[in-house]
Each structure stands twice: as structure tokens, then as C-alpha cells.
Amino acid sequence: EMPAIIVPRKTVNELQKLLKNSSGEVSAQVSETKINFSHENISLTSKLIDGKFPDYNRVIPSNNDKRLSVDAKAFVQCVDRVSAVSNERSRAVKLSLANDSLTFTVSNPESGSATDELGVGYSADSLDIGFNARYLLDITGQLDGDMAIFELADSGSPTLIRDEQDADALYVLMPMRV
């Protein structure tokens, strides 16, 4: 059985680049301080991060009763458009949900405001919630499926984001005040 380890993000990103056009199995050998990945003529060795992996199950919300179903590509386009006027420091975008409608709003005293609207699957109580636009784009840009599923509770609780076509893809995003 594989021991619990923490592999540096830089190593994972490098491995992805090296294996981008490859297929087949990748073997991993783990020592107390290092990991080695090998595939055909590729070998990558990295130090492991010293420490205990956090209990991530504690941060995955389980009582989010509001469900938003949205076309992932259209969502990315809307966030990208309205965030063009956000300030670089906060990058806050407000999402307003009501009756199968999602309104995106960004207000910036220096560059004005922007609003966009999208038809979505949402039938729960109205909700206004804010997120960092960069984080929304990073997460929804990773989804392989056509639909993104957001499971929400309220404007101050973590949101669960899922890829409708990949049951293993699970993202937790903390909201921000807007």
C-alpha cells in the first residue's frame, strides 16, 4: 500500500508537462524523503514535502442544500467578461442566484462596473455570494464536462464545485464578502 505523502505542486505540474503527449502506465517509487516517477524514457525525482497531509474531509461541506447547474464554458466566459473591470487586489465577483438565473456583478470605483446574466438550473431560495474571480476561473477551467455543479449553503459558507461528468473531481471554494 502506498504511504501518505505530499508531493510538491511544482513536481506535479512538471510531471503533467512531461507526460502531456504520452499514454500508458507511470511507475512511482517512494522513499522516506523522495519520490521518483518513471515512464518509458522519462524519469523525474523530487523531494517530498515533510509533514502530515491535512484531513481534507473536514473542509468538504456536507450540508449544502442549494444546487446550481451551469454550462461550464458559458460560466467561464461570463466571469472572464465581468472580472475585466475588477481590481487586481480583490478580484471579487458577486453571483446573484434566483429562479434559474445567475447574475454576475463586479463593481470597482476606479474602472466602473460590469454585469452579465446567464440562464442556469437553480430553484432554491435567492442567494447573493461573492468569490475571487481568479479562483472561479481556475476551478471551472479544470472541468472536463460540459456542466459545473455548485452546491451552496449561504453567503459565508464554503461552496462545493463538481464536474458533472467526473465524479472524482471535487473543489471547495471559500466565498468572500462583496
Over which residues does each language-model region extend?
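Short hinge/gating elements
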Residues: 59-61
